[in-house]
């Protein structure tokens, strides 16, 4: 039986730039950073104590997927406060905080154009 999500692959053009973005701007921590092949490393990040890894890696032949990841949602206690904090760090938002009946959300993108949702719990 499936127990949890082990990792999610985030396609990236420049692993060093993506690593700096996710760790310095978003506060992810490095779980693994090791050579994978001649061109790339296996970089796996974590958020807090979550068992799910975020892997900054693009398999050969899948470069067309860079910038197409969409709608991964990150839970935060306060969308507006997190928006202000990340916006102050230079994170680019495509949608400022919006309140809906189901909660508040905002959408930002990483340096490759992959988009993620900040969502209230």
Label the predicted regions.
Residues 1-19, 69-72:
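N-terminal beta-strand motif that seeds the catalytic metal site of vicinal oxygen chelate
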Residues 45-50, 108-111, 120-121:
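Active-site beta-strand termini and strand-to-loop segments that position acidic
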Residues 48-53, 62-64, 79-81:
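Short, charged/polar surface micro-motifs in flexible loops or helix N-caps
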Residues 54-57, 116-119:
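Conserved beta-strand in the GNAT
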